[in-house]
Amino acid sequence: MLLVRTTSLNVSRMPVPCLARGIGILKGKYRLANLMNAQPSVRHVSSEIQQKDQQAGESNTATDTGVIHKSDEETLIYFDNVYARTTSVWNPTLWYNLLLRNQSRDAVREKIRNLASPPNNPIYGLELKSTIPVKRDGGVFATFVVPPKYTKAQVNSLIQQNTARESSKNLLSYFTRASAFPVKGSPWIEDLRRLPSTTIVIKFQGPALTEEEIYSLFRRYGTIIDIFPPTAANNNVAKVRYRSFRGAISAKNCVSGIEIHNTVLHIQYENIRRGHLVSNFFTNHTRIAIPVLFALLSIFAVLVFDPIREFSIEQKITHKYSLSWDNKFWKQLKTLTSSTMTSIKYYWGGPDDNHQRKHLWEERIEKVNDLKMWLEENNNTFVVIRGPRGSGKHDLVMQHTLQNRANVLYLDCDKLIKSRTDPMFLKNAASQLGYFPIFPWIDSVTGVLDLTVQGLTGQKTGLSETKESRFRNMLTTSLMSIRRIALKNYKAFVSTGDGTVNVKEEDYLQQHPEAKPVIVIDRFEGKSEINGFVYKELSDWAAMLVQMNIAHVIFLTETVASNQRLSESLPNQVFKNLILSDASKENSRNYVLSQLEDYLYYNKKSKGENVKEPESEKETAENNDSDSEADTSVKKAEVILNEKELQEIDASLEPLGGRMLDLQAFVRRVKSGEEPSEAVDKMIEQASEQITQMFLSDKIDSNKSAQAWELIELLSANPVIPFHEIVNKPLFKAAPETGIMELENNGLITVSRDRGVLQEIRPAKPLYRAAFTYLINDPELAKVLKTRYLLKVVGFETGRIKKWEEELKPLGKVPDQKLFKTRLDYLSGKINASNAVITKCEEEIKNLSK
């Protein structure tokens, strides 16, 4: 069963000039006559679908079925340009209409009603029955009930005239003008993803129409550029190309489904596959296009992310928007409250925390002042502060020199060097510099892409980078941020009484050293087996900062090996050096007593012991003006402690020397409840375990372990060993400087130098000497380590003897032994000496095994 839906087409009332436009030949007139006598348009739709819908109780609206139903008393008009046409997915007018224009159903119906029957020229009795929007095409199908005194042709003509008149009143009518066309066919209401095109495809279900007939039928909807009639290969398809989208859209919606001489016309938009210049370039020139694409992506990433990274680095240095104590406003508030609380404490006789460390640093006040003075000088500031581990380099710079200074960047080389993987290294470097955002995973992706492109095109894209280049880029970006901070208050022109003066950037930086940020690079060693490039990159970067005069740079190091690296970066620069050593015995004692003052007082009070009440700090200062404030807390501690307790503390401090970190650890242990002697014994035991794990365990190289044990024995007996005594030791003869410097870099010893020449060898810190003695006095441990050392010496001497014996073999075959008597005597003496060493070592091993 087929459902036949008809649409009355009163052809006899159509204007003849409109239908006959462009037809000039007899054949065209003959076919036109046939067109005039065409039957009403018919589109066959299966009735089974409608029956199924009715049985299921579903709607049969045009939106759901794609078919418009109307009676003979109704006329169907298509209004175009009601919505924005979807000619492209990225058409901006769609968003404009969606956001700024009222597209509700009532608003559209009111607009159609005003166009068809305006108040100033109404069609009396005209009723708008329904509207069916086709937003993709930008139009609306409107069904009107024809008034009794009008015919359909008259109503259609009046609606067209009113629409043309009303839509042309707007100032923007050229763009917003609407048109009304009677629907001759049976339109198919579909919302498929078929975007409008200027070309429509006509499929003939029956004999094809001629070009004249096609022109006559479709010309009224817009200017036609060309008509492509059916071909021999495809004799039932024709194409019509319009100049504008409006013509093609109106023709498709008004004519589709019309039947002429038993031929039904089905019209759709042509699916045009436009050739894109960019896609063609990438398809046809792969070897060039892919590198160009990655280059463009890199440029885009730089343009977008580099300003963000520079801002984040500035934030890391200035802490302008940070809520930490490094923020400028928090620093001012902290200074104000700190000074206020200090005054209150002093008034009530409380302790002043600002002086608890002063006596330890009295011997370094001059160096702190020198460092502050260097930072205020106009000359390039390149400072190297060297001191043993735990000597207080970090506190000297960060707490005593730069505590209240703005714009400080602190870099810890140790965190960078110890990064095991490339992503972890990049994350640590970015965290140190404030470099954000960073995408470590991109390196893995770009590496795979680089290999893929190289396999396809034979050349690399250059997109993948090594961690060295990435780190160098981070430093370059940081340099730009530091320069911006240094020149923040710079003005190219300064007004004076005599006029305007042009100020150069170099002159401004020379006159305002306080504006330059301070870069502190801690734990700079100069060499490393893993990530050793960090030292070179940092030294080159620091040299550039100093040469550009945009920052002060301070290096904190433990050894002199860093000087060689820095000299390579700045060969003509004279470094400002600060050498830090351990505190004196008196200052160490004063520091510990000042830290333990309150603890000792309240500890004795809690035990019920009689404690002599010390005078308040204020009374002490008033009664004894000759004493400094720094000695006040020490005198309090001496009053609280008896002579025996003071002697115990003095004896406990003897192994610690003046190393600040060890003194702080000792104070913490005592405050936790340990006796001074117990605290120092545990520290010595802990240091000995550390030495054993780092230098004397089975996992360590046997030669290195034997060298370490030999130095431990010597340093346990003597606080200082001259370097020339080590040169003659068996295990150091081959490369004495290399062995000593390796142990120094690993933190077992420290070596003093005179113009680069090794002079004296000491333990890395005073506590190590007590740890050396502890290891020597431990019979079981000393027996194992001593035996291992002696076996290494025996092996070393045995190897030397074998080498000499190999040399003696050819000499023994010479007939005249007198020719090489001198060499033979030399080798014989060497072998005898080594034999004596081996014999001695074996005797010691035998004694140790008893």
From Swiss-Prot:
GO biological process: mitochondrial genome maintenance; mRNA processing
Transit peptide: 1-44
GO CC annotation terms, alphabetical: mitochondrial inner membrane; mitochondrion
Renumbered residue ranges of the record's region Disordered: 44-66, 607-633
Localization: Mitochondrion inner membrane
Keywords for the protein's UniProt record, in alphabetical order: Membrane, Mitochondrion, Mitochondrion inner membrane, mRNA processing, RNA-binding, Transit peptide, Transmembrane, Transmembrane helix
Biased composition (Polar residues): 47-64
Amino acid composition bias (Basic and acidic residues), ranges on this chain: 607-621
Mitochondrial intermembrane topological domain: 309-850
InterPro entries, sorted: Mt_escape_2_C (IPR018850), Nucleotide-bd_a/b_plait_sf (IPR012677), RBD_domain_sf (IPR035979), RRM_dom (IPR000504), Yme2_C (IPR039627), Yme2_RRM (IPR034260)
GO molecular function terms listed in the Swiss-Prot or TrEMBL record: RNA binding
Pfam families to which the protein is assigned, alphabetical: RNA12, RRM_1
Protein topology in the membrane: Single-pass membrane protein
Domain RRM per the UniProt entry, residue ranges: 198-272
Transmembrane segments: 288-308
Mitochondrial matrix topological segments: 45-287
Taxonomy, superkingdom: Eukaryota
Miscellaneous notes: Present with 5260 molecules/cell in log phase SD medium.
Job of this protein: Plays a role in maintaining the mitochondrial genome and in controlling the mtDNA escape. Involved in the regulation of mtDNA nucleotide structure and number. May have a dispensable role in early maturation of pre-rRNA.
PANTHER family (UniProt xref): MITOCHONDRIAL ESCAPE PROTEIN 2
Family: Belongs to the YME2 family.
UniProt protein name: Mitochondrial escape protein 2
Organism name: Saccharomyces cerevisiae (strain ATCC 204508 / S288c)
